Protein backbone atom coordinates (compact mmCIF):
# COMPACT_ATOMS: atom_id res chain seq x y z
CA UNK A 1 0.00 0.00 0.00
CA UNK A 2 1.37 3.40 -0.95
CA UNK A 3 2.16 5.92 1.76
CA UNK A 4 -0.57 8.50 2.27
CA UNK A 5 0.25 12.00 1.11
CA UNK A 6 0.83 14.54 3.83
CA UNK A 7 2.61 17.81 4.46
CA UNK A 8 6.40 17.76 4.87
CA UNK A 9 7.50 17.61 8.50
CA UNK A 10 7.83 21.11 9.90
CA UNK A 11 5.79 22.67 7.08
CA UNK A 12 2.25 23.26 8.23
CA UNK A 13 -1.10 23.93 6.59
CA UNK A 14 -2.87 27.03 7.89
CA UNK A 15 -6.47 25.87 8.10
CA UNK A 16 -9.64 27.94 7.56
CA UNK A 17 -10.31 28.34 11.28
CA UNK A 18 -6.79 29.74 11.71
CA UNK A 19 -6.61 32.14 8.78
CA UNK A 20 -8.84 34.89 10.29
CA UNK A 21 -6.28 35.40 13.07
CA UNK A 22 -3.45 35.45 10.52
CA UNK A 23 -5.31 38.01 8.41
CA UNK A 24 -6.01 40.13 11.49
CA UNK A 25 -2.34 40.09 12.48
CA UNK A 26 -1.06 40.79 8.98
CA UNK A 27 -3.52 43.64 8.34
CA UNK A 28 -2.77 45.20 11.73
CA UNK A 29 0.95 45.26 10.96
CA UNK A 30 0.39 46.50 7.39
CA UNK A 31 -1.72 49.46 8.58
CA UNK A 32 0.92 50.42 11.13
CA UNK A 33 3.72 50.26 8.56
CA UNK A 34 1.70 52.40 6.16
CA UNK A 35 1.32 54.97 8.93
CA UNK A 36 5.09 55.04 9.47
CA UNK A 37 5.85 55.48 5.77
CA UNK A 38 7.17 52.01 4.89
CA UNK A 39 6.61 50.64 1.37
CA UNK A 40 6.05 46.97 0.61
CA UNK A 41 8.43 44.99 -1.59
CA UNK A 42 7.96 41.38 -2.73
CA UNK A 43 10.92 39.13 -3.55
CA UNK A 44 11.10 35.55 -4.90
CA UNK A 45 11.34 32.73 -2.37
CA UNK A 46 14.21 31.16 -4.35
CA UNK A 47 17.60 32.84 -4.83
CA UNK A 48 21.05 31.81 -6.02
CA UNK A 49 22.81 30.01 -3.16
CA UNK A 50 25.81 32.33 -3.48
CA UNK A 51 23.65 35.23 -2.26
CA UNK A 52 23.26 33.70 1.18
CA UNK A 53 26.85 32.47 1.41
CA UNK A 54 28.09 36.01 0.74
CA UNK A 55 25.65 37.75 3.06
CA UNK A 56 24.88 35.44 5.98
CA UNK A 57 28.38 33.93 6.14
CA UNK A 58 29.66 30.51 5.07
CA UNK A 59 30.52 29.42 8.62
CA UNK A 60 27.11 30.19 10.14
CA UNK A 61 24.75 27.41 11.22
CA UNK A 62 22.21 28.58 8.64
CA UNK A 63 24.54 28.13 5.66
CA UNK A 64 26.33 25.05 7.00
CA UNK A 65 23.34 23.06 8.24
CA UNK A 66 19.93 24.60 7.65
CA UNK A 67 19.45 25.76 4.05
CA UNK A 68 17.27 23.97 1.51
CA UNK A 69 19.64 23.96 -1.47
CA UNK A 70 19.24 22.20 -4.80
CA UNK A 71 20.60 22.26 -8.34
CA UNK A 72 18.24 23.25 -11.16
CA UNK A 73 18.26 21.91 -14.72
CA UNK A 74 20.80 24.52 -15.76
CA UNK A 75 23.23 23.35 -13.11
CA UNK A 76 22.75 26.47 -10.97
CA UNK A 77 22.73 26.08 -7.19
CA UNK A 78 19.51 27.57 -5.81
CA UNK A 79 18.25 27.95 -2.24
CA UNK A 80 14.87 28.52 -0.63
CA UNK A 81 15.41 31.76 1.26
CA UNK A 82 16.24 31.19 4.95
CA UNK A 83 15.75 34.90 5.76
CA UNK A 84 14.67 38.06 3.98
CA UNK A 85 17.39 40.69 4.41
CA UNK A 86 19.81 39.29 1.83
CA UNK A 87 17.09 38.98 -0.81
CA UNK A 88 15.88 42.51 -0.08
CA UNK A 89 19.41 43.90 -0.42
CA UNK A 90 19.81 42.03 -3.69
CA UNK A 91 16.56 43.55 -5.01
CA UNK A 92 17.57 47.03 -3.88
CA UNK A 93 20.90 46.72 -5.70
CA UNK A 94 19.45 45.13 -8.82
CA UNK A 95 16.83 47.84 -9.27
CA UNK A 96 18.89 50.82 -8.11
CA UNK A 97 16.52 51.75 -5.30
CA UNK A 98 19.20 53.52 -3.26
CA UNK A 99 20.89 55.37 -6.10
CA UNK A 100 22.24 58.78 -5.18
CA UNK A 101 21.98 58.05 -1.49
CA UNK A 102 18.19 57.97 -1.59
CA UNK A 103 16.71 56.62 1.67
CA UNK A 104 14.40 53.63 1.40
CA UNK A 105 12.05 52.28 4.08
CA UNK A 106 10.81 48.87 2.92
CA UNK A 107 8.86 45.94 4.33
CA UNK A 108 8.03 42.43 3.16
CA UNK A 109 6.05 39.40 4.24
CA UNK A 110 6.33 35.75 3.33
CA UNK A 111 7.61 32.26 4.05
CA UNK A 112 11.22 31.42 4.95
CA UNK A 113 12.79 27.96 5.05
CA UNK A 114 15.33 26.34 7.38
CA UNK A 115 16.01 22.65 7.94
CA UNK A 116 15.82 22.74 11.74
CA UNK A 117 14.37 20.27 14.22
CA UNK A 118 10.66 21.16 14.38
CA UNK A 119 9.17 21.98 17.77
CA UNK A 120 6.62 24.37 19.23
CA UNK A 121 7.31 27.79 17.72
CA UNK A 122 10.02 26.54 15.35
CA UNK A 123 9.24 25.19 11.90
CA UNK A 124 11.00 24.37 8.65
CA UNK A 125 8.68 26.68 6.74
CA UNK A 126 7.90 29.74 8.82
CA UNK A 127 6.59 33.20 8.04
CA UNK A 128 8.13 36.57 8.75
CA UNK A 129 7.37 40.23 8.37
CA UNK A 130 10.60 42.13 7.83
CA UNK A 131 11.57 45.81 7.66
CA UNK A 132 14.72 47.13 6.00
CA UNK A 133 15.89 50.77 5.94
CA UNK A 134 18.72 52.00 3.72
CA UNK A 135 20.79 55.22 3.63
CA UNK A 136 19.80 56.38 7.11
CA UNK A 137 22.69 55.92 9.52
CA UNK A 138 21.70 57.65 12.75
CA UNK A 139 20.39 56.16 15.99
CA UNK A 140 17.06 57.87 15.29
CA UNK A 141 16.04 55.30 12.67
CA UNK A 142 17.19 52.43 14.93
CA UNK A 143 14.93 53.93 17.59
CA UNK A 144 12.03 54.27 15.14
CA UNK A 145 12.12 50.55 14.38
CA UNK A 146 11.96 49.72 18.07
CA UNK A 147 9.30 52.35 18.83
CA UNK A 148 7.23 50.99 15.96
CA UNK A 149 7.32 47.46 17.38
CA UNK A 150 6.51 48.80 20.85
CA UNK A 151 3.41 50.43 19.42
CA UNK A 152 2.47 47.19 17.66
CA UNK A 153 2.77 45.22 20.90
CA UNK A 154 0.41 47.74 22.47
CA UNK A 155 -2.16 47.39 19.70
CA UNK A 156 -1.97 43.58 20.00
CA UNK A 157 -2.18 43.67 23.79
CA UNK A 158 1.11 41.84 24.45
CA UNK A 159 3.40 44.56 25.84
CA UNK A 160 3.52 43.07 29.32
CA UNK A 161 4.68 39.72 27.91
CA UNK A 162 7.71 40.89 25.91
CA UNK A 163 11.09 42.33 26.89
CA UNK A 164 13.56 44.31 24.78
CA UNK A 165 17.23 43.27 24.86
CA UNK A 166 19.92 45.50 23.33
CA UNK A 167 23.60 45.31 22.50
CA UNK A 168 26.13 46.97 20.23
CA UNK A 169 28.56 44.91 18.15
CA UNK A 170 30.54 47.96 17.08
CA UNK A 171 32.26 48.36 13.74
CA UNK A 172 34.12 45.55 12.01
CA UNK A 173 37.40 46.97 13.37
CA UNK A 174 36.31 47.08 17.01
CA UNK A 175 34.62 43.71 16.64
CA UNK A 176 37.91 42.32 15.32
CA UNK A 177 39.77 43.54 18.41
CA UNK A 178 37.11 42.02 20.64
CA UNK A 179 37.25 38.72 18.75
CA UNK A 180 40.98 38.44 19.46
CA UNK A 181 40.42 39.03 23.19
CA UNK A 182 37.50 36.60 23.33
CA UNK A 183 39.40 33.83 21.54
CA UNK A 184 42.37 34.29 23.88
CA UNK A 185 40.12 34.01 26.95
CA UNK A 186 38.09 31.04 25.70
CA UNK A 187 41.18 29.19 24.52
CA UNK A 188 42.46 29.28 28.08
CA UNK A 189 39.25 27.49 29.18
CA UNK A 190 38.94 25.16 26.20
CA UNK A 191 38.43 22.01 28.28
CA UNK A 192 35.34 23.56 29.91
CA UNK A 193 33.60 24.42 26.63
CA UNK A 194 30.99 22.14 25.10
CA UNK A 195 31.78 20.49 21.77
CA UNK A 196 29.70 22.90 19.68
CA UNK A 197 31.34 25.93 21.30
CA UNK A 198 34.80 24.47 20.65
CA UNK A 199 33.86 24.22 16.98
CA UNK A 200 32.50 27.77 16.94
CA UNK A 201 35.65 29.06 18.60
CA UNK A 202 37.53 28.10 15.44
CA UNK A 203 34.94 29.27 12.90
CA UNK A 204 32.79 32.04 14.43
CA UNK A 205 33.93 32.90 17.98
CA UNK A 206 31.22 35.47 18.75
CA UNK A 207 28.58 32.77 18.35
CA UNK A 208 29.94 31.09 21.49
CA UNK A 209 28.28 33.93 23.43
CA UNK A 210 24.91 32.61 22.26
CA UNK A 211 25.41 29.13 23.73
CA UNK A 212 22.67 27.41 25.72
CA UNK A 213 25.14 25.03 27.39
CA UNK A 214 25.29 25.65 31.16
CA UNK A 215 29.00 24.81 31.53
CA UNK A 216 29.99 27.16 28.72
CA UNK A 217 27.71 29.87 30.12
CA UNK A 218 29.59 29.61 33.41
CA UNK A 219 32.87 30.19 31.57
CA UNK A 220 31.40 33.25 29.84
CA UNK A 221 30.58 34.99 33.12
CA UNK A 222 34.11 36.41 33.29
CA UNK A 223 34.69 36.69 29.55
CA UNK A 224 35.66 40.06 27.99
CA UNK A 225 32.70 42.34 27.23
CA UNK A 226 32.09 43.83 23.80
CA UNK A 227 31.27 47.19 25.41
CA UNK A 228 34.89 47.54 26.54
CA UNK A 229 36.11 47.32 22.95
CA UNK A 230 33.65 49.65 21.23
CA UNK A 231 35.05 52.49 19.15
CA UNK A 232 33.88 56.04 19.88
CA UNK A 233 31.54 56.12 16.88
CA UNK A 234 29.71 52.95 17.94
CA UNK A 235 29.56 54.04 21.57
CA UNK A 236 28.07 57.42 20.62
CA UNK A 237 25.55 55.71 18.34
CA UNK A 238 24.50 53.30 21.08
CA UNK A 239 24.15 56.06 23.67
CA UNK A 240 22.00 58.00 21.19
CA UNK A 241 19.72 55.01 20.74
CA UNK A 242 19.33 54.47 24.47
CA UNK A 243 18.56 58.16 25.00
CA UNK A 244 15.75 57.99 22.45
CA UNK A 245 14.28 54.85 23.97
CA UNK A 246 14.40 56.50 27.39
CA UNK A 247 12.62 59.54 25.97
CA UNK A 248 9.93 57.29 24.47
CA UNK A 249 9.47 55.47 27.76
CA UNK A 250 10.43 52.07 26.34
CA UNK A 251 12.07 49.75 28.90
CA UNK A 252 15.07 47.67 27.85
CA UNK A 253 17.94 45.63 29.24
CA UNK A 254 21.51 45.50 27.94
CA UNK A 255 22.49 41.95 27.03
CA UNK A 256 26.27 41.82 26.38
CA UNK A 257 25.93 38.27 25.00
CA UNK A 258 23.43 39.23 22.31
CA UNK A 259 25.22 38.70 18.99
CA UNK A 260 22.54 37.39 16.54
CA UNK A 261 23.16 34.42 14.26
CA UNK A 262 24.09 36.24 11.05
CA UNK A 263 27.54 37.60 10.20
CA UNK A 264 26.41 40.86 8.62
CA UNK A 265 25.33 42.72 11.78
CA UNK A 266 27.23 45.72 13.18
CA UNK A 267 26.58 48.33 15.86
CA UNK A 268 22.98 47.98 17.09
CA UNK A 269 21.45 44.54 17.60
CA UNK A 270 18.20 43.89 19.46
CA UNK A 271 15.68 41.20 20.27
CA UNK A 272 12.15 41.19 21.64
CA UNK A 273 11.82 38.08 23.81
CA UNK A 274 9.07 36.46 25.86
CA UNK A 275 9.00 33.82 28.57
CA UNK A 276 5.52 32.66 27.55
CA UNK A 277 6.60 30.37 24.70
CA UNK A 278 9.26 28.21 26.31
CA UNK A 279 12.57 27.76 24.49
CA UNK A 280 11.50 29.64 21.36
CA UNK A 281 11.26 32.98 23.12
CA UNK A 282 12.48 35.41 20.44
CA UNK A 283 9.51 36.94 18.59
CA UNK A 284 11.28 39.81 16.81
CA UNK A 285 14.96 40.55 16.19
CA UNK A 286 17.25 42.66 14.07
CA UNK A 287 19.92 45.28 13.98
CA UNK A 288 22.23 47.37 11.85
CA UNK A 289 24.22 46.01 8.87
CA UNK A 290 26.14 48.99 7.49
CA UNK A 291 28.63 46.91 5.49
CA UNK A 292 26.30 44.39 3.87
CA UNK A 293 25.37 46.30 0.71
CA UNK A 294 29.03 46.95 -0.12
CA UNK A 295 29.86 43.34 0.73
CA UNK A 296 27.30 42.27 -1.89
CA UNK A 297 28.79 44.46 -4.60
CA UNK A 298 27.06 47.79 -4.07
CA UNK A 299 28.32 51.20 -3.07
CA UNK A 300 28.75 51.90 0.67
CA UNK A 301 25.16 52.05 1.95
CA UNK A 302 23.98 51.90 5.54
CA UNK A 303 21.23 49.51 6.51
CA UNK A 304 19.15 48.51 9.51
CA UNK A 305 16.16 46.25 9.92
CA UNK A 306 14.40 43.47 11.74
CA UNK A 307 12.12 40.49 11.22
CA UNK A 308 9.25 39.25 13.36
CA UNK A 309 8.06 35.66 13.43
CA UNK A 310 4.37 35.46 12.58
CA UNK A 311 3.82 31.94 13.95
CA UNK A 312 5.37 32.82 17.31
CA UNK A 313 3.46 36.07 17.66
CA UNK A 314 0.17 34.38 16.80
CA UNK A 315 1.00 31.66 19.33
CA UNK A 316 1.67 34.40 21.89
CA UNK A 317 -1.67 36.08 21.13
CA UNK A 318 -3.44 32.76 21.69
CA UNK A 319 -1.46 31.98 24.85
CA UNK A 320 -2.31 35.38 26.34
CA UNK A 321 -5.94 35.15 25.12
CA UNK A 322 -5.51 38.40 23.20
CA UNK A 323 -7.44 37.25 20.12
CA UNK A 324 -10.29 39.71 19.45
CA UNK A 325 -13.66 37.98 19.80
CA UNK A 326 -14.85 39.05 16.36
CA UNK A 327 -11.83 37.37 14.72
CA UNK A 328 -13.21 33.90 15.37
CA UNK A 329 -16.49 34.82 13.64
CA UNK A 330 -16.30 34.63 9.86
CA UNK A 331 -20.00 35.17 9.12
CA UNK A 332 -22.22 38.03 10.32
CA UNK A 333 -25.51 37.00 8.73
CA UNK A 334 -26.72 33.65 7.36
CA UNK A 335 -29.58 33.68 4.85
CA UNK A 336 -31.92 30.68 4.75
CA UNK A 337 -34.27 30.33 1.76
CA UNK A 338 -37.00 27.73 1.22
CA UNK A 339 -38.33 26.98 -2.25
CA UNK A 340 -37.03 27.83 -5.69
CA UNK A 341 -38.75 31.22 -5.91
CA UNK A 342 -37.40 32.22 -2.50
CA UNK A 343 -33.90 31.08 -3.46
CA UNK A 344 -33.94 33.28 -6.56
CA UNK A 345 -35.24 36.25 -4.57
CA UNK A 346 -32.65 35.64 -1.83
CA UNK A 347 -29.80 35.83 -4.34
CA UNK A 348 -31.05 39.12 -5.80
CA UNK A 349 -31.76 40.60 -2.36
CA UNK A 350 -28.38 39.59 -0.95
CA UNK A 351 -26.54 41.28 -3.82
CA UNK A 352 -28.47 44.52 -3.25
CA UNK A 353 -27.50 44.37 0.42
CA UNK A 354 -23.84 43.79 -0.50
CA UNK A 355 -23.96 46.86 -2.76
CA UNK A 356 -24.99 48.98 0.23
CA UNK A 357 -22.92 47.19 2.90
CA UNK A 358 -19.69 46.01 1.23
CA UNK A 359 -18.11 45.03 4.56
CA UNK A 360 -21.01 42.82 5.66
CA UNK A 361 -20.13 39.12 5.82
CA UNK A 362 -23.30 37.58 4.43
CA UNK A 363 -23.55 33.90 3.60
CA UNK A 364 -26.44 32.34 1.65
CA UNK A 365 -27.35 28.74 2.35
CA UNK A 366 -26.28 26.44 -0.47
CA UNK A 367 -27.68 23.01 -1.16
CA UNK A 368 -31.31 23.71 -0.20
CA UNK A 369 -32.50 21.60 2.76
CA UNK A 370 -35.29 21.70 5.30
CA UNK A 371 -35.87 24.59 7.69
CA UNK A 372 -34.28 22.58 10.50
CA UNK A 373 -31.15 21.67 8.53
CA UNK A 374 -30.63 25.21 7.20
CA UNK A 375 -31.12 26.72 10.63
CA UNK A 376 -28.63 24.24 12.06
CA UNK A 377 -26.06 25.35 9.48
CA UNK A 378 -26.81 28.99 10.30
CA UNK A 379 -26.09 28.36 13.97
CA UNK A 380 -22.94 26.35 13.20
CA UNK A 381 -21.60 29.13 10.96
CA UNK A 382 -21.18 31.38 13.98
CA UNK A 383 -23.35 34.10 12.45
CA UNK A 384 -24.93 36.68 14.72
CA UNK A 385 -28.23 36.69 12.86
CA UNK A 386 -30.25 34.48 10.54
CA UNK A 387 -32.39 35.78 7.69
CA UNK A 388 -35.36 33.59 6.77
CA UNK A 389 -37.10 33.77 3.40
CA UNK A 390 -39.92 31.40 2.48
CA UNK A 391 -43.04 31.57 0.34
CA UNK A 392 -45.05 33.53 2.93
CA UNK A 393 -42.32 36.13 3.44
CA UNK A 394 -41.77 36.43 -0.30
CA UNK A 395 -45.46 37.11 -0.87
CA UNK A 396 -45.30 39.97 1.65
CA UNK A 397 -41.92 41.26 0.42
CA UNK A 398 -40.44 40.84 3.89
CA UNK A 399 -37.69 38.67 5.35
CA UNK A 400 -37.46 37.11 8.80
CA UNK A 401 -34.69 38.46 11.02
CA UNK A 402 -33.68 36.30 14.00
CA UNK A 403 -30.86 36.87 16.53
CA UNK A 404 -28.74 33.75 17.07
CA UNK A 405 -26.37 34.83 19.84
CA UNK A 406 -28.50 36.81 22.24
CA UNK A 407 -31.93 37.92 23.33
CA UNK A 408 -34.54 39.03 20.87
CA UNK A 409 -37.55 37.71 19.02
CA UNK A 410 -37.77 37.08 15.31
CA UNK A 411 -39.20 40.01 13.37
CA UNK A 412 -40.06 40.70 9.77
CA UNK A 413 -38.13 43.38 7.87
CA UNK A 414 -39.25 44.85 4.55
CA UNK A 415 -36.92 44.11 1.64
CA UNK A 416 -36.16 47.79 1.06
CA UNK A 417 -35.37 48.35 4.75
CA UNK A 418 -33.10 45.33 5.21
CA UNK A 419 -29.77 47.02 4.48
CA UNK A 420 -30.47 49.86 6.90
CA UNK A 421 -31.53 47.40 9.59
CA UNK A 422 -28.40 45.29 9.15
CA UNK A 423 -26.24 48.41 9.20
CA UNK A 424 -27.64 49.26 12.62
CA UNK A 425 -27.47 45.76 14.09
CA UNK A 426 -24.26 44.39 12.55
CA UNK A 427 -22.03 46.98 10.92
CA UNK A 428 -22.46 49.58 13.67
CA UNK A 429 -22.57 46.95 16.42
UniProtKB/Swiss-Prot annotation:
Can you supply a Gene Ontology BP term from the record?
histidyl-tRNA aminoacylation
**Catalytic activity of the protein:** tRNA(His) + L-histidine + ATP = L-histidyl-tRNA(His) + AMP + diphosphate + H(+)
- According to the UniProt entry, what is the EC number of this protein? 6.1.1.21
**Can you quote a single GO CC term?**
cytoplasm
Cited CDD domains: HisRS-like_core, HisRS_anticodon
Principal localization reads cytoplasm
Q: List the SUPFAM superfamilies hit by this protein, alphabetically.
A: Class II aaRS ABD-related, Class II aaRS and biotin synthetases
- Which EC class is the enzyme in? ligase
Looking up InterPro entries in the UniProt record yields: aa-tRNA-synth_II, aa-tRNA-synth_II/BPL/LPL, Anticodon-bd, Anticodon-bd_dom_sf, His-tRNA-ligase, HisRS-like_core, HisRS/HisZ, HisRS_anticodon
Where it sits in the cell: the answer is: Cytoplasm
GO molecular function annotation:
ATP binding; histidine-tRNA ligase activity
Taxonomy, superkingdom = Bacteria
Q: Which UniProt keywords apply?
A: Aminoacyl-tRNA synthetase, ATP-binding, Cytoplasm, Ligase, Nucleotide-binding, Protein biosynthesis
Q: State a single Pfam family of this protein.
A: tRNA-synt_His
Q: Does the keyword Lipid metabolism apply?
A: no
Which PROSITE patterns does UniProt cross-reference here? Answer: AA_TRNA_LIGASE_II
What NCBIfam families does the record point to? hisS (TIGR00442)
Q: Which HAMAP family match?
A: His_tRNA_synth
Could you describe the subunit structure of this protein? Homodimer.
| Entry's family note | Belongs to the class-II aminoacyl-tRNA synthetase family.
Question: What protein name is recorded for this chain?
Answer: Histidine--tRNA ligase
Species annotation: Pseudomonas fluorescens (strain SBW25)
Q: Which gene encodes it?
A: hisS
Amino acid sequence: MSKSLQAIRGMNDILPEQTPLWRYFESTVARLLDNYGYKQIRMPIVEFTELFKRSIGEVTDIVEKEMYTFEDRNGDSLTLRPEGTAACVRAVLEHGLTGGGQPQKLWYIGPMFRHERPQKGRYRQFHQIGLEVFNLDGPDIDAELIVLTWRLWGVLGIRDAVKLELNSLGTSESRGRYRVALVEYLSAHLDKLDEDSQRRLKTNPLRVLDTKNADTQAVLVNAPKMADYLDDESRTHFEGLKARLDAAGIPYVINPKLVRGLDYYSKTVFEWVTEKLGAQGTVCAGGRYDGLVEQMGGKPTTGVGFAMGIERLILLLETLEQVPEEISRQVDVYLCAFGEAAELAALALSEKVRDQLPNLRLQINAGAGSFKSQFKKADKSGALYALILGEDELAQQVIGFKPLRGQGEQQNIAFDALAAHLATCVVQG
